[in-house]
Each structure stands twice: as structure tokens, then as C-alpha cells.
Amino acid sequence: MTIKNQIKNFISYGFHKYLGMTVTEYMNSVSVNVIQPEKYQGIFDYPFFVETRIPIEEQIKLLGIDDYVNAANLTHLNEQINFPYVAWTHDLSLHAGKTISETYSSYLEIETGCTAIEVIAFAVHYPSLCKGRGIDAPSTIFRGEYFACLIAHEENYELASHWIDDRTENFYCLTRGKEVTK
């Protein structure tokens, strides 16, 4: 899905209205022209648009996601980016079969774990890759050794938690390249 279509996807959920913008104002407030960094080619080939001007708990409401962890109380390990951006990720296969802790220990130098808001954005933009799967956010802690995850059922999504060393079938860690584009 193109970045322009991803932005339109968020518009369809009313993100522009939440920000007090018209559709045109919202479209003009973000960049749709992004170029994949050469070092990401073949590793992080999926661009995804992340909206950070709306708090995660409000995005969850707009998107109709069931919140079983109280998103407002999550702890993010990555520095929070305070502008909308495009990040580059994979199709969930990069760390297939690994626990969250195993994923940490196998990060590439150019890689970081996704936060819950990034996992949500990825799932909204690439639903066909996510349906029937659990997607771990290895940079967002729920409590102790439990991390935020998004479970993508056929008809709905739920924000839940997943233990750092659990190897549940059909759970995947989402990571991305460290660089993002404003």
C-alpha cells in the first residue's frame, strides 16, 4: 500500500477530524514522498505511516481496537517520535519463530523494535499480513516481562500482552529500520 493510501486509510477512521483538520489539511500535513534507504533494501521493504499527533489510547478508540492492557499506561523503550513519520519494516518473517528476548539478541545494527503505536499502524495498513497472528511490540512494555502485542483476529483487533520468553505459534516480533522519514 502506498503512503498516500495509508494516509487515506487513517482518514477513513476519522484521524483528520480528531486533529480538527479537513481531509485536504490532513493530507497536506504529512509527506507522501519517501525513498527507501538503500541499506534497508531486501530487509525492510514495507513502508508504513505512523501518526503520532494522536495518543495511542485515542487511536485505539478510533480504530475500534479492544484494549486489554490500558494503552495509556504502557512504557515505551524507544525515544518517542513527536511528528508523523514513515518507517520501514518487514513482512513479519524476519524474526519468525523467535521469542521477544531472542529477537532482541539478534537485532541487526540498523534495526530497532517497534512500539505498540507502530505495530497498530502496520496492522491497519497491511491487514492481510496480520490476520490470524499476534504481533509483538518489542519496544513497549506492559508490565514486568510482559510486552504489548496486537492480536489480529479475522474481524477485530485486540491490544494485549505477551511474555518475553513465550514461543506461541503465530506470534511474530515486528521490528523496523532505525531511521524514519518525516
Model features per residue range: what roles?
Residues 1-112, 116-182:
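A binding-site-centric feature that preferentially detects glycan-recognition modules on secreted/surface proteins
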